[in-house]
From Swiss-Prot:
Name of encoding gene: recR
Protein name: Recombination protein RecR
Gene Ontology terms: biological process: DNA recombination; DNA repair
Keyword Zinc attributed: yes
Function: May play a role in DNA repair. It seems to be involved in an RecBC-independent recombinational process of DNA repair. It may act with RecF and RecO.
Length: 198
């Protein structure tokens, strides 16, 4: 059976989503066309609107519909604290903890020389400019604890320390509610090394 080209195009478009392979994309496309055409139309409108309206904040590089995002404009925030994250999703997770009251800088990625991603690709010059504006007192590195995230944190830390800035890193350890029996040895080791007095 020859599939309609429009359906093939939809399937290929859905494959661009992370974690969606050819079979999942095909199932989604067929579901939308067979059971939820209104949902498909809404999805199309939402994607078009987001692509048209969402841009990067001129100050922190996160997603916004304005030149400067609401977080950067919030007078209640401490401009002396700058938290560096890899993605807007990481920023959202930190915001949901209600523990950080400073400002952010979103890298939109992480260093990965094997993938050809260098300092320019993660907006390092923009970060340095922001961090050395005379207002920022401390930069909190909240990159992920992957090899690339660690390399990114190290590179940024060395770069900013050389300019006289105080740089800190998120602590690592046992998750809240986690039982040691189910935590991997690397996490327990890091928690032991990063322990603090109470």
């Amino acid at each position: 059976m020859k599939t309609p080209s429009s359906l093939d195009f939809l399937t290929e478009a859905l494959r661009r989503l992370p974690g969606v392979g050819p079979k999942s994309a095909q199932r989604m496309a067929y579901h939308l066309m067979q059971h939820d055409r209104d949902g498909a139309a809404m999805l199309g409108r939402a994607l078009s609107q987001a692509v048209e309206k969402v841009q990067h904040c001129a100050m922190c590089n996160t997603f916004t519909e304005h030149e400067v995002c609401e977080t950067c404009l919030d007078a209640e925030r401490n401009p002396a604290l700058l938290c560096v994250v890899e993605t807007p999703g990481d920023q959202l997770m930190i915001e949901q903890t209600l523990t950080f009251k400073g400002l952010y800088f979103v890298l939109m990625g992480r260093l990965s020389p094997l993938d050809g991603i260098g300092p320019k690709d993660i907006h390092l010059e923009k970060l340095i400019s922001r961090a050395t504006d005379g207002i920022v007192q401390e930069v909190v590195l909240a990159t992920n604890f992957t090899n690339e995230g660690e390399a990114t944190a190290h590179y940024i830390s060395e770069t900013l320390k050389a300019r006289g800035l105080k740089v800190s890193r998120l602590a690592r350890g046992v998750p809240v509610g986690g039982e040691l029996e189910y935590v991997d040895a690397g996490t327990i080791a890091r928690a032991m090394l990063d322990r603090r007095t109470t």
